[in-house]
Every structure is written in structure tokens, then in C-alpha cells.
Amino acid sequence: MILHKHETTGGLVVLRKFKAGQTIPAHAHPEANEWAYVLEGEWEESGTIYTAGTLFFAPKGTHHGPHIARTEVISLTVFDGPLTVE
């Protein structure tokens, strides 16, 4: 769910929910840095486990992932530019 979109930069604030076992393949965001704050659950990212209260950061253009929801996960994610994926 998009909570806010910046009119000038295209940056986004997104509330995301993942079902347990859901996987997002490795990817990069060429136009935006990504910050994901885990509100609930357990998320595995490139071999690192993130739990409620932890913050993940992926610099613009950096390949990261796969994302694996080890449990149901709710996160608040910020992209500081347009959300593009490669």
C-alpha cells in the first residue's frame, strides 16, 4: 500500500505485507535507495535475518536479495526516487 508519493522525486513510502514463504528474486533499484524497517515478522535478505525493529538498506543500483519472508512480514519501506526494478 503506497502511503505517500513525492511529487518531484517520485520517492515512495510503502507499507508492505508478505505471506510466510513468499520470495522476491534478487534485483536492483537503479534510481532509488531503499530502506525497509521490519514492523512484524522475520525476513531473510541475502543471508541476513531481519526481525521486528531492524532496518535494511540497499543503496541505489545495488543488487540485493532474494527476499524471503520466513514468517508473515509487515514492513515500512522508503524509496528516495522512482521505483524501478532491474
Where are these regions (language model features)?
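A short glycine-rich, His/Asp/Glu-containing loop-to-beta-strand
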Residues: 1-25
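Short glycine/serine/proline-enriched coil/turn segments at secondary-structure junctions
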Residues: 7-10, 47, 67
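Short, well-ordered beta-strand segments in beta-rich or mixed alpha/beta enzyme
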Residues: 15-18, 39-41, 75-77
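Glycine- and acidic-residue-biased ligand/ion/polar-headgroup-sensing regions
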Residues: 20, 29-45, 52
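Histidine-centered metal-chelating micro-motifs
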Residues: 23-25, 44, 56, 60-65
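Ligand-binding loop in jelly-roll beta-barrel domains
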Residues: 32, 49-50, 60-86
